[in-house]
């Protein structure tokens, strides 16, 4: 009875079990299956991992080319040659965020307050007047108001 139902399922789904077990393609001694391209589970996992690493490696050089530092050549006045054979490399390495107050050097951790001047301060020095902030809040405020409220000039009215 059970064998008949298995045969019916195999006919309906179109999946047939092989008559003889298939050895792994990589000759590791284990049996493979059609779902894993005739490889055992370990060999299949290794090949999938290798394929994903290969695709990541192919994509990575494209990203690294765009983020490479700029190389500029310093030339003499009119000779057109590179001065002393040196090349100047510009690197923009972002600094890690500071976890200390810039005024008192107290550790602030996650409770630090970031100022518009670019510093991190403790609760005592978080205000602009307490840490002698160099950021011009008034000028930035004026610029924001000017952007948000453009000057509207109407056309002159012609008198009849």
From Swiss-Prot:
Keywords: Metal-binding, Stress response, Zinc, Zinc-finger
Positions annotated as zinc finger (AN1-type): 95-141
Renumbered residue ranges of the record's region Disordered: 73-94
Induction: By dehydration and salt stress.
Superkingdom of this protein's organism: Eukaryota
Entry-linked SMART domains: ZnF_A20 (SM00259), ZnF_AN1 (SM00154)
Zn-finger region bounds: A20-type: 18-52
GO MF: DNA binding; zinc ion binding
Binding positions (Zn(2+) 2): 101, 104, 122, 125
Cross-referenced SUPFAM superfamilies: AN1-like Zinc finger (SSF118310), Glucocorticoid receptor-like (DNA-binding domain) (SSF57716)
Binding site for Zn(2+) 3: 115, 117, 131, 133
Protein residues bound to Zn(2+) 1: 24, 28, 40, 43
Pfam family, one: zf-AN1
Function description: May be involved in environmental stress response.
Protein's recorded name: Zinc finger A20 and AN1 domain-containing stress-associated protein 6
Species whose genome carries this gene: Oryza sativa subsp. japonica (Rice)
Organism taxonomic ancestry: Eukaryota, Viridiplantae, Streptophyta, Embryophyta, Tracheophyta
